[in-house]
Amino acid sequence: MSRIRIVALVLLAACYGRDNPPRPHTAPTPAPTPIAAAPIDTADTKAKLIAKHGDAHRARIEQGVDQVAKLWRPEDGDRTAFGAFCDEQFLADPNARDALFERMQTMLEQINGHNLEVGRATRWHTEVDTGPMQPIDALLAGYDPSAHVVDDLFASKVAFAALLNFPLTTLEARLRDGTSWDRRAWAEARLTGWFDTRVPSNLAQAATAAEVAADQYIAGYNIWMHHVLGEDGKRRFPSGKRLISHWNLRDELKANYADDEGLHKQRTIARIMERIVTQTIPRGVIDNPHLDWDPFANKVTAGQEVEADAPKRTTTLDDAREPDTRFQHVRAHFLAAREIDKFSPIAPTRIARAFDAAEMPEQRVRALLVELLESPLAADAAKEMTQRLGRKPEPHDIWYEFGVPTVESELDAITRVRYPTADAFAKDIPRILKDLGFTPERAQYLSDRILVDPSRGAGHAMGAERRGDKAHLRTRVEAGGMDYKGYNIAVHELGHNIEQTFSLNEIDHTLLSGVPNTAFTEALAFLFQARDRALLGLPSQSAEVERLRVLDAYWNTREIAGSALVELDVWSWLYANPNATAAELREATVRIAREVWNKYYEPTLGGHDTVLLGIYSHTITSPLYLFNYVLGHLIAFQVEEHVAGKDTATFATEFERVCRLGAILPDLWMQQATGKPVTAEPMLRATEAALRSGR
């Protein structure tokens, strides 16, 4: 499906609010994109239209007719019907064409927005913690009201009217010519982007079903840590601590650098992660506090202490491993994508569609990943880390935090008192926004358009897509209140919601709502997340804290770069081995994760053949998304550098301004936001300076 539909759930803000009238449409029309040979003879139709409207419209007529013909099917009508449609719907008058554009834009906002609301309702009980789920909830969540939209718009010929009158563009053309387009030209490109492929609704529904099943699988992938034993058999985690993979496991590991028993805990968590990736984890211990588990010996014993609120689970002692369920979900995504590939001539693989949605070529993204991974700064950063740790680095130190260590329990105490419920966080949003620099009026305007829901999963942001609807912030609140991990995620998701709200309600063309790609949504959310401790009233950062923040940004970005590279290589392997079983996919994933680790991480962290790079749950729920996080960190760093040293009011003003640049090319967006294209150089330069000043 189109780029617009791919990124629909994460569309954020765009430029020109209601106080800023749109500029005249003065930029050159996007250059015609070569179209494959039409399945029917178009010569007669073109000749008649040129004779009717004049040679001045020849280029538009030829391109529009070819665009329609390429996706016209026998059920749409015969040659006569095709010609009649083109004769009736081609618009030579600029005013009529403008009216069509506005009709289409308004229609798509309403269709997209209402379908999102229906989908949000059908998935409500699987995504929001409303109590025990009912059997029907999973079935309702599998319903996708938008699955038939594009199919129906083709069947009704609405899609063909857009393709006949507005240019369809390829990524290559947008990269080549897009810098000269004005916003109307970009909006036209986004309009036809809805219809660049014609995927049958049953295939779209199958892809959605795979996504829902994977989401539910991961949402239930919790480890009850009080029932996980260390290598010495000791129970080190408190009763009731339930961690979802991978987010909470990773964050718990990061939080234990200041703990007296932290190293033992970290080694235990790392072993859990390895068991998950290799699928040697006993299936009986997943989300089960009735069994104790030693992940080192991989032995299951009867639970000695069971929490009062423990869910009903098996008490049967069984060491049988999880039967490659993790990779069955990846394979299901792949099989659904393969069917869609046949109907995606512009981007004929899931990989190609991911980069088409990002509007950055795969080769360029891979080059950025490798640039980070091969930088010699890693050795210097690891050397400082080793000195701070006072021990030899271990593989789990890939998640080391250079920042000033804080015992997580101290932060938990603050957040649990302040946010006993999701509603308490919602009521505090105006204060949070004012502390970030937004005016009281702006803070209230934004908070009035955001609802907070208790999440079953780790948390996420769901923006509205129709003016009049509201964005939803999903955050996980355990019994006893929101812990720091949940708060940290909630602040991140709030950043998404603020972007989404600006986008939807203040935009010249709703077709340009959002940002160039999902990496930018993550980048702007990271700007909020980086200020989470300040929002709790903790001391402002010193020069040393700022230096360590830079090292953190580099170390974290480099960590995700490896995981992203593993995922890209896994999907390339899948396309080269389309008949692979889940077991074969597991073996390939483990092999690739080890190869990337051994090449880029073993020199600084040791751990030959470590598989930790395969732990990210995104690879199960949202395939080919991880590279966006790397881009997001780079973009966030560039934007943060742009607002560095400015007061909070300036931060808020600049945050809104860059959010409102719209869904244009990534480099064009970044150039207008910071004066530089997307690059790793600012981060690497700052990292080098931070390392030098710390010596």
Which sequence ranges carry the predicted segments?
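C-terminal, non-catalytic "cap/extension" segments appended to globular domains
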Residues: 32-305, 333-406, 578-695
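Sec-dependent signal peptide recognition
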Residues: 2-9
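Active-site recognition of the HExxH zinc-binding catalytic motif
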Residues: 473-504, 525-526
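C-terminal motif of bacterial Sec signal peptides marking the signal peptidase cleavage site
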Residues: 12-14
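Post-HExxH zinc-binding segment in Zn-dependent metallohydrolases
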Residues: 502-558, 632
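Bacterial signal peptide processing site
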Residues: 16-18
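Short, glycine/acidic-rich hinge or "gate" loops at secondary-structure transitions
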Residues: 286-291, 441-447, 506-520, 538-545, ...
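Auxiliary, metal-adjacent structural segments of Zn-dependent hydrolase domains
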Residues: 405-469
